Regions:
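Generic alpha-helical segment signature
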Residues: 10, 23, 36, 57, ...
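A general alpha-helix detector
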Residues: 16, 60-66, 106, 110, ...
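Basic, short loop/linker segments at the boundary and entry of helix-turn-helix/winged-helix-like folds
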Residues: 23-66, 71-72
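Amphipathic alpha-helical interaction elements
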Residues: 18-22, 31, 35, 71, ...
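Short amphipathic alpha-helical interface patches used for protein-protein assembly/oligomerization
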Residues: 89-93
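Short secondary-structure boundary/capping segments within folded domains
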Residues: 18-21, 53, 228
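Hydrophobic alpha-helical membrane-insertion signals
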Residues: 1-28
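Anion-binding and metal-coordination hotspots
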Residues: 3-6, 72-85, 96-476
Length: 476
């Protein structure tokens, strides 16, 4: 019979914890690129040094959360259990094999009560700036999209509520341009629905809409997923660069449309980086987004969108526009004149009924019961026309094709490798903090791995070419 190895579970040994962690372990790479002095300085006012019992090292608490997000552990409770038995995790925290790990409730309390609300944003920005200082970012083209995160709420526990319809960011500017056109047409200006001190210069709305509100987590929103499935969710509206680094994120309820939350993400990223191209999917193809990006000197890259009108009858492109006379001409030569502009920014063109009554194609052009054809186009339609011409260029096609390699890859990694399919947190503030830390960990992982590869290449290059002494070093 084989001489099997004896049980060594109770064998006392003397071991060096440093030797047990592989040299190429991810946490070693992260420890090499991270600095924590700024965290001690930032959090020093939140700890008392001359009263009470000694507190837990705040950097250790932050490292525990980073471990959770780096390795896709679903909860802090499970993270606490994993750290207890994982040698590499203990090494990263600076704890020995027999040291007690801080309880997960201590970590949760620190982020909810003790640490400042903006700490997670500062950690995210610090890691992003470190990547920027090492020339790893390429924000010349950014990619914006949103992904849903399943909320910790029972979809069967809800109530219907009437809530005020939120005013759009551009409502004030749109109202002013609409009134300018209406005055030229001899029409009465549209009055504001709200007070004159509206932050966007007027244009708020007193309209109310019915929404499904969760009684478990009122901050989330009902997301319709497919034809039959509905669930409460949050949405992370995210922007990344060409190399997959996450540049900004805005978390909203799951029933907020992508184009509504776009402004905050766009303004945040473009205020920090020199952006030339902005690539987005069809959900962002609106007149306002096209106008704002073009007015800012950026090039929007948007996809083809299928015509959603009736398949029977004339299509919008069958009507020819004359910019000098500001009229549309139907396929039978009848002019449709600009009669008014409504509060939504739609220019309304109408034909003359006496000419259309006897037209043989009256039913084909979808004229109304008065025998009059009504044609509408947006006041900012020319910006959408420019976007459409950009879409057809080789550069536009090339940049849009990179979405699957950038923003879609970010969401895939976040859900598959970093446990972002659902959240245990409740409340918009808590979920926002959770998402920012997760994206900070993803940026940190990419930063550490790329820095490690660069250092290995530099070491090999120096050994092969001794005369080369100015090897690139990591910038802190």
């Amino acid at each position: 019979m084989e001489d099997w190895r004896k049980d060594a579970r109770h064998e006392p040994i003397i071991v060096d914890l440093e030797a047990l962690v592989p040299k190429d372990h991810l946490l070693r790479k992260i420890e090499k690129v991270m600095d924590y002095e700024w965290l001690y300085e930032r959090l020093d006012p939140y700890y008392c040094h001359d009263n009470g019992r000694p507190g837990t090292d705040p950097v250790v608490l932050i490292k525990m959360v980073l471990i959770q997000h780096l390795f896709g552990i679903p909860s802090l409770r499970q993270t606490y259990r994993e750290i207890q038995v994982n040698v590499a995790y203990r090494w990263f925290l600076g704890y020995g094999l027999l040291d007690n790990i801080p309880h997960f409730a201590t970590v949760s309390y620190a982020f909810c009560k003790r640490f400042p609300d903006e700490l997670t944003s500062e950690i995210f920005e610090h890691i992003l700036n470190k990547a920027l200082n090492n020339r790893m970012l390429d924000p010349s083209a950014i990619f914006i999209d949103g992904t849903h995160i399943k909320a910790s709420a029972n979809k069967k526990k809800f109530q219907k509520e009437r809530v005020a319809k939120a005013a759009k960011v551009y409502s004030g500017q749109l109202r002013r341009e609409v009134n300018t056109e209406r005055e030229k047409l001899g029409k009465k200006p549209i009055e504001d629905d709200d007070d004159e001190n509206h932050p966007q210069g007027g244009g708020g709305s007193r309209e109310t809409v019915e929404k499904t509100v969760s009684t478990t987590d009122p901050d989330c929103g009902m997301f319709v997923k497919g034809e039959h499935e509905r669930q409460f969710a949050y949405e992370a509206h995210t922007a990344c660069d060409k190399r997959g680094f996450i540049l900004g994120v805005e978390v909203t309820a799951g029933n907020i449309h992508d184009s509504v939350a776009w402004d905050k993400v766009y303004d945040d990223v473009t205020s920090k980086f020199d952006v030339q191209f902005v690539a987005m999917d069809a959900g962002y193809k609106t007149p306002w987004i096209a106008k704002k990006t073009l007015d800012d000197g950026k090039i929007p890259v948007l996809p083809y969108t299928r015509y959603k009108g009736s398949k029977e009858g004339y299509r919008p492109w069958d009507y020819k526009y004359d910019p000098v006379k500001d009229v549309f001409t139907c396929p039978h030569g009848q002019e449709l004149r600009h009669t008014t502009t409504d509060r939504d920014g739609k220019r309304i063109y109408r034909s003359t009924p006496k000419y259309c009554v006897s037209c043989l194609s009256k039913s084909y052009c979808k004229a109304n019961e008065k025998g009059q054809k009504v044609f509408t186009t947006h006041i900012w339609q020319e910006y959408l026309d420019i976007v459409e011409s950009i879409r057809k260029t080789d550069l536009g096609k090339q940049i849009y094709a990179q979405r699957k390699e950038t923003i879609e890859r970010v969401f895939a990694d976040a859900k598959e490798k970093h446990a972002m399919r659902y959240t245990h947190h409740r409340g918009l503030a808590a979920v926002t903090r959770w998402v920012r830390l997760k994206f900070a960990a993803m940026n940190l992982k990419k930063l550490a791995q790329w820095s490690w590869k660069d250092s290995m290449f530099s070491l090999l290059f120096v050994r092969c070419c001794p005369i080369y002494k100015n090897a690139p070093t990591f910038a802190y």
